[in-house]
Amino acid sequence: YDKITIVINTFNSDDKIHLCLNSIESKTKVIIVENSNNVNFKDELEKKYTNLECILTGQNLGYAKGNNLGLSKVKSKYALILNPDATLSKDTLENFLVTAEKLSDFAILGPAKQDEYSKDEYNIDKNQIFQVNSLNGFAIFLNLNQFKEVGFFDENFFIYLEEIDLCKRLKSKNKKIYLDKKVIINHIGGSSHNENINFEMELSRNWHW
């Protein structure tokens, strides 16, 4: 999948990142932005996964700045921003690509979500693609040429609300955001687990301040 680069923003994610990475097709480019100076983490990942580049930030940048850094390194047409506590299904990327080529004018595509709490988050036909106002940031598929005017995440946000702000700015420029029920991404811990990751990042930032 040379049209897609996956960007994963991590912070002390050693215990969950391998499940995520093992679910990704080995030919797909992956950029990890690790919010620390953990050289062992970088070396271990780059040795095990030849499709992966790990950037060490040396400090906790947060969701917006970390993902923007990763996106600045992307050279492909599309990027998938993925949480480290999410895993792809075997046809996730293929389904994203099929929909992307069909729609062509979209800015963001979002998946249906499956986790232990919610096996079917949207009670609609599973083949349906429909426009939405915003998406959950645990997995968002970006059509990068649609972001030249808007930019990516506002770095004034450290944790929470970044994806909502981005979606609002996209909508203000008449950019289109879709949810595709055919695309399934498993969110391992569900929303509460994701909040724990964000809470750890927030605690770390406050501690350093």
Regions found by a protein language model. Give the residues of each.
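Short, well-formed alpha-helical segments that are part of the catalytic scaffolds
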Residues: 10-26
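Acidic helix N-cap motif at the loop->helix transition within catalytic regions
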Residues: 16-18, 39-47
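A conserved acidic beta->alpha catalytic loop
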Residues: 23, 34-42, 59
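Glycine-rich, basic loop-to-helix element that forms the pyrophosphate-binding segment
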Residues: 56-74
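Short aromatic/hydrophobic "clamp" motif used to bind/position activated sugar donors
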Residues: 79
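Conserved donor NDP-sugar-binding/catalytic core segment of glycosyltransferases
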Residues: 87-122
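A recurrent flexible, glycine/aromatic-enriched loop bordering the glycosyltransferase active site
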Residues: 125-145, 149, 164-166, 194-195
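Active-site-adjacent helix/loop segment of glycosyltransferases
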Residues: 168, 172-209
